[in-house]
Regions:
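Mixed-charge interfacial surface used for oligomerization/domain docking
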Residues: 2-23, 29-39, 43-184
Length: 184
């Protein structure tokens, strides 16, 4: 996977540029989770932390980053074998939106089945309320990833910005990309 490729690249770069350091950390994350994590690590670098201190912070804090996902379309869950055709049909008829997150090993785990887009948007923000450092006083950054659903992403971002008035800037919305989109 990505971490193995990064380790191979680090070894090749170490041979070619022996005076430079490349350290690899498995963030156990994905998509904008990587981006948010790297943004924090760049801040530490800019504060004058050594590469080893940044790596140590990354390893100690990688599980503090929360990834929550939802989908309003069950088609690809059926095609990917995650749910049966019957479950997909009934879930679609009942407007079920699965809410998932990532466990401590980076695997996607279904957590809840929620009826309706509005309800799942409310719940995903409640999850941020439950997990954000400092609760509603959270003053870090927030990234949202989406795939062809800008209106839904904007609805989540607006609610996050309303509930967390001390965010460091506006919520950043990004596309998840085809690899992550097809995997989930």
């Amino acid at each position: 996977g990505s971490v193995s490729s990064a380790r191979i690249a680090a070894e090749e770069l170490a041979e070619k540029y022996p005076d430079n350091k490349v350290l690899v950390v498995d963030s156990l994350g994905a998509s904008s989770g990587y981006g948010l994590f790297m943004d924090k690590l760049a801040d530490l670098r800019d504060e004058g932390k050594s590469i080893e201190e940044v790596r140590d912070f990354a390893e100690a804090n990688r599980l503090h980053l929360h990834h929550w996902f939802f989908s309003t379309d069950l088609t690809f869950y059926v095609r990917g074998g995650r749910i049966s055709k019957a479950a997909g049909w009934f879930g679609t008829a009942l407007k079920i939106c699965p809410l998932l997150n990532m466990d401590d090993e980076g695997h996607l785990i279904p957590r809840q089945k929620i009826r309706g887009k509005k309800a799942v948007i409310q719940q995903i923000v409640k999850e941020m309320e439950n997990h954000a450092q400092g609760g509603h006083d959270y003053n870090g950054k927030c990234f949202i990833s989406m795939s062809a659903c800008m209106d839904d992403a904007r609805a989540v971002a607006d609610l996050v910005e309303e509930k967390f008035p001390h965010l460091n800037g506006k919520v950043m919305i990004n596309n998840i990309g085809t690899t992550i989109g097809s995997h989930t």
